[in-house]
Amino acid sequence: MNTEALIEAAVEVDVQEAAPVVEPDIEVIPAIEAPAASLPAIVAPNLDDSSLYIHRELSQLQFNIRVLEQALDESYPLLERLKFLLIFSSNLDEFFEIRVAGLKKQITFAREQAGADGLQPHQALARISELVHGHVDRQYAILNDILLPELEKHQVRFIRRRHWTAKLKAWVRRYFRDEIAPIITPIGLDPTHPFPLLVNKSLNFIVELEGIDAFGRDSGLAIIPAPRLLPRVIKVPEEVCGPGDNFVFLSSMIHAHADDLFQGMKVKGCYQFRLTRNADLALDSEDVEDLARALRGELFSRRYGDAVRLEVADTCPKHLSDYLLKQFNLHESELYQVNGPVNLTRLFSITGLDSHPELQYPPFTPAIPKLLQNSENVFSVVSKQDILLLHPFESFTPVVDLLRQAAKDPHVLAVRQTLYRSGANSEIVDALVDAARNGKEVTAVIELRARFDEESNLQLASRLQAAGAVVIYGVVGFKTHAKMMLILRREAGEIVRYAHLGTGNYHAGNARLYTDYSLLTSDDALCEDVGKLFSQLIGMGKTLRMKKLLHAPFTLKKGMLDMIARETQFALDGKPAHIIAKFNSLTDPKIIRALYKASQSGVRIDLVVRGMCCLRPGIAGVSHNIHVRSIIGRFLEHTRVFYFLNGGDEQMFLSSADWMERNLDKRVETCFPVEGKKLILRVKKELESYLTDNTHSWLLQSDGRYVRSMPTGNQNARSAQATLLERLSNPVLSVR
């Protein structure tokens, strides 16, 4: 599949002219419609006008809705379609735990603050509720009416109670008696048994009872919390249900045998529910003496934050759902009635069935550059030239190998490393431990506040400290999100620096799922800059002048704004001007205003924004030269790439940062140049493969809608990820 050439439009369309945003024959999906902008045609638009901006949370929701749409795409294997549906659930959980919780908190403390779009938090919550209710209903309809029936055709069955045979009922009874009942603790509700404090996102049941117990109590209600250690999906042996993969939901088992938990009482109804709580840590790092100790205390509190959402079975009577809403101090608009398990993310356990490889993506082996294949010593290769890798198409192994070799190399003196998310069984951490034990000076800058990875990071910090490494937790008030490694090695009597800089985390698992760039370099100036940044993080001192590296919160934002302004001036001077940027999110108002000005001046701007985008493209007189697309596919798009035509002297940058205020103003981030015509051309071609994608590309319209791009006429189907997979990796019979 050849998509290496520039888009014809990118070559032929004059940058001074507006190009249409919507291509012909594009499938429009009204379900993801956002509030439309009403923009009068004015000569000098006010770039602070709120109608020029899309609300952040609504844009984030639309990304998740695009993820849900993939569950309907028959070009994906069936179990992968199920994964997309489950990712929608997982993303929605975090959205409520963090974003919705934040909006509710503003209202609670009377601190409502509108963003650039002008929408107040209470208005945003109303729109969020409307959107989410509709798409949660749609999600369960896709599951029940499309995916589960299709899976059944492949002998993957989720057997509902109404279809249980006598043999299956007997097996379920034994399983319930032996594995479930002994560890379940039902709680009757009365004055001495108050409503329990339920853990965030845990599975629970509200039970309506009739009768009087041994103590003469007649409460009428009970709660059954399902222990988290129990699997939510249980596989049934073939001798019970016949051949195939047959599963029963834990919730169905508890429903069927709730009577056994209340001997002598009549169960009138048993209904599953799940509560979502605020999971954002209320930790002010400036007010604590020991961040690690304070964080351990906050992690426990996270499980019991304020309620933000209630999910119940759609068969639950109104008087019971109203009772639950009252217990959790929630409004009826925060109630979600679902036709199926209340926590679909627990179905991830069955998406990798060994018995059905045909229902999953075909395996592949990430490639290793020939230069590294032919050399056992990574240092000898990197000392001669930069090595650029694009994961997962190219392997993350060279990055790990560099650190492993450093750990054993007698000439290596010191290793410095940032860690944001590295996983529980990290090869990177293993190598750092080995390096410390082998007498190297190892310093790890670990970001303890990486959301939902805090506990894992605390554990690896303890492990590194036990090995003798120096561990610090970044800078108070700023998350350390930069991805960088520095190795100091003595060669011919001198200390030589080697560095790794990346757009993604030091996480070998994610490197198989996320697209990210890695640069291995021994460039003197760049490695010196990395050393300076580590000195800033580890010690104290004034801002140090960098030669090549842009870094937040100091020079990165200004550098980006300056480069956008430079392209703007080229366009005003009648010269070709072009910006291509690919990243995860665009929310920073200053960056958006700069892009609007560039568009007005005639700069052609192509943005590939996977997630949130608060900019409205295609507005006459404002953003008519801006095109925004989002790519959703097999791999999570995670690279941050910035290209500037620069009057013909092209510049390319890779970064750990998105164009968001939090990244540019409140985090430690890096942005580094891609140097040399060969590497710049390579990255540019890879960017262009995304701009020509017409199978997994969604185009953002000026009214906030996304429409899916599709091949037109005799146009061949083009997928950026498929092209890069074909070009860079090696398909094989088994994953390695």
From Swiss-Prot:
One of its GO terms (biological process) is polyphosphate biosynthetic process. Catalyzes the reversible transfer of the terminal phosphate of ATP to form a long-chain polyphosphate (polyP). Mg(2+) binds at residues 421, 451. GO terms for molecular function: ATP binding; metal ion binding; polyphosphate kinase activity. It is an enzyme of class 2 (transferase). SUPFAM superfamilies: Phospholipase D/nuclease (SSF56024), PHP14-like (SSF143724), PPK N-terminal domain-like (SSF140356). This is Polyphosphate kinase. The lineage of its organism: Bacteria, Pseudomonadati, Pseudomonadota, Gammaproteobacteria, Pseudomonadales. It comes from Pseudomonas syringae pv. tomato (strain ATCC BAA-871 / DC3000). The active site is at residue 481. One of its GO terms (cellular component) is polyphosphate kinase complex. Its cofactor is Mg(2+). Keywords: ATP-binding, Kinase, Magnesium, Metal-binding, Nucleotide-binding, Phosphoprotein, Transferase.
